[in-house]
Structure formats: structure tokens, C-alpha cells
């Protein structure tokens, strides 16, 4: 069975996007050869990419026409989009889950040989945190205090104890921390 892994990039003060959806200027700060290598390693070990609607729409709009090794992975890998409001998912290899999201993700996880990655998707991530489905959290902290935006984790989530697996400092100043969920 593969693991369900959250992957996100946040600012030092905890924001994963600006005040507007897809406002992500801090990504440029941490992106470089190391982050590209890290991203490719994750994609190479993925059975599925899992998104909420907003992240799915943004990712699809970008990656459908992008070129390069990461784009090839993003377009080739099976994608799961969890949304009650979408009627279809047209990005290559996409499957739409409209109901019983946690139950359906748990079933996919049980059948997976490799890992499943949730990128962005704060609302979906909250659902999966509440259901205690994440096995691992991978967070890259960008060396910037944004001062405002949307927090990755909202108030009122249940406590989840974690254990640090590893941390890696990037030449860009970012730090990737990997935490295991202590279910």
C-alpha cells in the first residue's frame, strides 16, 4: 500500500497562497535545480496526484501546455479531482470523485503500490486531515514573511501528532521538512 502525502510550499508565516487564488510569488524564491530534482523524485514515485477543484483547474490550465520532464509526468500520471460542483474532469488521465471523498481516497490508497500526492488543495486537505488519512506531510518553507494571504491550515482542525523524518535546506534558502503521521 502506498502512502497519502501532502505536499505544499508555504511562507514562514504559514501562508500557502496570497489573498487571491493562485497568487504564489514565493514559489519563485524556492524554485531551483534542487526543487526540480525533488519534484521529479516525488512524481516518479507517484501512483496518483490528488487535487481539489480549485487546484485542479489551475494545474490543468498550466500543465496541459507546459513542456519538460515535470510536465510530462504531470500530464501522464493518473489524477483524482475531488469536487461536488464539477461535472467532468478533462485533463488527461483524470477521474472525478463527487461524493464520499475520504472513503474513496482510502480505497485508492489501499490499492496503490506507490504514493498518492495531494498538491495545494487546502479544503480537500482539511477533509483528509479530519479523517486522519495522511501518512506523511511534506512542507517546503519559503524564506519570506508574506504578511497576508490564505493559511494552509485553518483553525479548528483536530490535533495530529507528527514525527520529523528529515529536513533539507535548499540553496535557495527554503527548507523541506518531511513529517510522518503518528496515527
Regions found by a protein language model. Give the residues of each.
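Enzymes that bind and transform nitrogen-containing heteroaromatic metabolites
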Residues: 1-183
Amino acid at each position: 500500500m502506498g502512502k497519502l502525502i501532502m505536499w505544499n510550499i508555504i511562507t514562514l508565516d504559514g501562508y500557502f497562497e496570497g489573498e487571491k487564488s493562485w497568487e504564489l510569488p514565493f514559489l519563485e524564491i524556492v524554485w531551483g535545480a534542487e526543487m526540480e530534482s525533488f519534484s521529479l523524485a516525488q512524481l516518479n514515485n507517484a501512483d496518483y496526484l490528488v487535487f481539489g477543484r480549485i487546484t485542479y483547474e489551475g494545474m490543468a490550465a498550466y500543465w496541459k501546455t507546459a513542456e519538460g520532464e515535470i510536465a510530462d509526468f504531470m500530464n501522464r500520471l493518473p489524477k483524482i479531482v475531488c469536487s461536488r460542483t464539477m461535472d467532468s474532469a478533462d485533463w488527461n488521465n483524470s477521474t472525478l470523485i463527487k461524493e464520499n471523498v475520504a472513503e474513496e481516497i482510502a480505497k485508492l490508497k489501499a490499492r496503490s503500490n506507490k504514493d498518492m500526492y495531494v498538491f495545494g488543495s487546502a479544503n480537500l486537505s482539511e477533509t483528509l486531515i479530519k479523517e486522519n488519512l495522511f501518512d506523511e506531510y511534506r512542507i517546503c518553507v519559503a524564506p519570506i514573511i508574506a504578511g497576508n494571504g490564505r493559511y494552509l491550515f485553518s483553525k479548528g482542525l483536530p490535533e495530529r501528532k507528527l514525527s520529523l523524518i528529515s529536513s533539507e535546506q535548499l540553496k535557495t534558502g527554503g527548507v523541506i521538512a518531511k513529517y510522518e503521521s503518528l496515527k
